[in-house]
Regions:
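The substrate-binding groove and active-site-proximal loops of carbohydrate-active enzymes
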Residues: 4-14, 41-56, 101-117, 184-202, ...
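Short, acidic/polar
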Residues: 12-28, 113-126, 232-238, 299-308
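Catalytic domains of carbohydrate-active enzymes, especially glycoside hydrolases
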Residues: 17-43, 128-133, 305-317, 388-398
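Aromatic-lined substrate-binding rim segments of carbohydrate-active enzymes
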Residues: 22-24, 40-91
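Hydrophobic targeting/anchoring helices
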Residues: 30, 38-40, 132, 143-146, ...
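Active-site-adjacent "subsite" loops/lids of carbohydrate-active enzymes
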Residues: 72-129, 138, 142-146, 163-194, ...
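Conserved, mostly hydrophobic/aromatic
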Residues: 119, 126, 134, 211, ...
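A conserved amphipathic helix/loop scaffold
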Residues: 381, 386, 391, 398-401, ...
Length: 647
């Protein structure tokens, strides 16, 4: 199936011919399937300047020239209520007002009737200029990445109307009510969240009415912000138009990053969003933004890795920002076009494989339920994935349905009800001590095999790991693990010592327990979730700890394959419906891998690699029977993902 790949283009009439030729090239080489011309329509001036009229005249020139070339195009409404940037002149409409601070920002409240007329007119005008599609950008939001929600006079009035009983609460009073732990807080959050969503959804309906007045079949798509995908499914359905797929671009951008650490967070964000959208929309797009669209911000290989990893989570295309929009610098986009064109077949083949994958290894849980009540935890944690697993070459994945080894730290357990947690604990779990303490407080202590206590004794000096009896620094956030059964296995030990003389055992560093539910609980005395630094990270980031995790994953039956070296590798493993084993190798480090060495549960008889054109080609490999490793005769360069099939 073809992917939905959009490319954002400027309405730069001084370079009309060059831009149209570029679009033709992008279509022909597989970079994009639809070009969207950017229109920034956040109102400015009093009365507002007729931006849509001015920009549509420019659009006509591009539309007509592309039509002569047999090509289509659409429009990106890049700003509607506004991203909050400085405006040349203020508009005459109600501004967004933070519910807590009372601060106003340069964003329009979509409850404002004048603005609603303005934006409906804009959609009507755009539709009359006959684009192939209209995409609404991600400034159209109120709760996500804003000041806690809009508490402007219009929203306060609507809140009071819905509360009833002649209510006349002030913004400050509503803000306080939202934090109330009891029934008042429950009702206040329900009504407040409703007002935020109502303002957006009603405004989106007016946008669609504008399009429908010209062409009810004109497709529309939506870009959301935040892992809670604020109203995204509802808005996408409204904007889609008669008989068209519901399309949402999720929010997982990765531009202006100082390094490749935490790259997996891009994919966790995608997984969080897709878990909430999967059954409600038809097409999900990656946010492959390179803002401000040059390689000083985002390398072409970073873009390639980003797109590849997001396809693995279930995306079926992307909104590519690969063209400088405010300067004529076509050189800045050349490398992006080369990589996306070269791998277009790879992306399509990978997207087609994804529905047939059954992931193995460590499971980083995400939630399929949006949570806007600020009193509650809205998602899991990326401590295990960001801080440990994405660098160790051990297989892990993101999922709303727990399987494999569920990895929890901090308050991540809060995404599960008690009944769900019973199910989780009937399987395999990696628990940081802070999460284990929370589970004990919830009544699940018998499932863990240990009690968790604050340590008030002698200073922990080091932890001894089973691999070669090597020592490492103590874990951060350390607590005492107290075994409550002889069946608890002490997998590593924390010691006190002065200059390594006469070491004194303090307590376990990690334990293993087979509980009565049939599950296996691995509890660590600290947490992996730390800021990357010399003094915090390297209790987990070392080869001896990696070997401990390998042993534990084998005990859980969740290690079909892993990357055996010490390069920083993000690794995925999954059983495929055809009986083969799928492996994805993402080299996130700066050192090239000349040949990929995998530890394998079962030695393969055959190995194939997904080529850039989407075909599979056989690759040579050698087997080390003693080490149970397989060395694949193919390199893995930095940010150049390698997809393998073992059978």
């Amino acid at each position: 199936m073809k992917l939905h790949n959009y490319t954002i283009m400027p309405l730069d009439t001084d370079h009309l011919e060059e831009i149209c030729e570029d679009i033709k090239h992008q279509y022909e080489n597989g970079t994009a399937t639809c070009a969207l011309f950017m229109m920034t329509l956040v109102p400015e001036g009093n009365p507002p300047v007729d931006k849509v009229g001015i920009l549509c005249k420019k659009y006509d020139l591009f539309r007509d020239r592309l039509a002569e070339m047999g090509l289509g195009s659409g429009v990106l409404l890049q700003a509607s209520i506004g991203h909050g940037w400085v405006l040349s002149e203020m508009y005459p409409y109600q501004s967004y007002t933070g519910i807590d601070s009372g601060d106003t920002v340069r964003v329009v409240c979509p409850y404002d009737e004048g603005f609603r007329d303005y934006i409906k007119h804009a959609f009507t005008v755009i539709a009359s200029h006959k684009p192939d599609t209209i995409m609404l950008d991600d400034d159209f939001r109120l709760l996500s990445a804003r000041l806690g929600g809009c508490g402007c006079p219009l929203h306060v009035a609507r809140f009071n109307e819905l509360w009833g009983e002649g209510a006349s609460f002030t913004r400050e009073e509503i803000s306080a009510m939202l934090d109330d732990p009891g029934e008042i807080g429950d009702r206040a959050n329900e009504i407040f969240i409703y007002t935020q969503h109502e303002a957006m959804i009603d405004c989106a309906r007016l946008m669609r009415e504008g399009s429908d007045s010209v062409d009810p079949s004109l497709p529309g798509t939506f870009c959301c912000v935040g892992n809670n995908v604020e109203c995204a499914a509802e808005i996408a359905e409204i904007l889609a138009g008669e008989g068209n797929p519901r399309v949402v671009r999720l929010n997982n951008g990765h531009y202006t990053q100082p390094c490749n650490h935490n790259f997996s967070n891009v994919f966790r964000n995608a997984a969080e969003s897709i878990a909430k959208l999967r059954e409600r929309v038809d097409v999900i797009l990656a946010e492959t933004d390179t803002c401000p669209q040059n390689r000083y911000s985002t390398s072409a290989m970073s873009l390639h890795t980003h797109f590849t990893g997001t396809l693995l989570e279930g995306a079926r295309g992307a909104k590519h920002w690969i063209t400088r929009l405010h300067a004529w610098e076509p050189e800045s986009g050349a490398a992006y076009r080369r990589i996306l064109g070269k791998y277009c077949g790879f992306y399509e083949a990978l997207a087609d494989i994804v529905p047939h994958l059954h992931h193995r290894g460590c499971c980083i849980p995400v939630t399929g339920t949006p949570q806007f009540d600020r009193r509650k935890v809205s998602g899991g944690s990326g401590g295990w994935s960001n801080c440990v697993l994405e660098r160790m070459g051990l297989p892990f994945f993101f999922a709303a349905e727990p399987s494999g080894i569920v990895c929890l730290d901090g308050a991540a357990d809060a995404i599960y009800s008690d009944k769900q947690m019973e199910s989780v604990l009937s399987g395999n779990v990696f628990l940081a001590s802070d999460t284990a303490k929370r589970l004990i407080d919830r009544g699940f202590g018998d499932d863990l095999g240990v009690d968790i206590r604050d340590w008030t004794g002698k200073q922990p000096s080091y932890e001894m790991l089973p691999y070669r009896n090597n020592e490492c620094s103590v874990q951060c956030g350390i607590r005492e693990l107290v075994p409550m059964s002889d069946a608890v296995i002490e997998h590593s030990t924390v010691y006190h010592s002065v200059s390594r003389v006469n070491p004194e055992r303090l307590f376990p560093g990690a334990t293993v327990y087979n509980n009565a539910r049939g599950g296996k609980a691995f509890v660590f005395c600290g947490t992996p979730n730390v800021h990357y630094s010399l003094t915090t990270s390297f209790s987990f980031l070392n080869q001896s700890r990696k070997q401990q995790l390998i042993d534990m994953m084998r005990m859980a039956g969740q290690l079909p394959a892993y990357y055996a070296g010490d390069e920083e590798v993000y690794f995925r493993a999954a059983n495929v419906d055809d009986g083969s084993l799928f492996c994805a190798v993402f080299n996130l480090g700066m050192d090239p891998i000349d040949a990929i060495t995998l530890g394998c549960e079962t030695v393969p008889q055959k190995m194939e690699m997904l080529d850039c054109d989407g075909t599979r080609k056989a690759v040579a490999f050698t087997v080390n029977e003693e080490a149970k490793t397989v060395t694949v005769d193919t390199p893995a360069y930095t940010l150049a993902p390698v997809i393998l099939f073992l059978s």
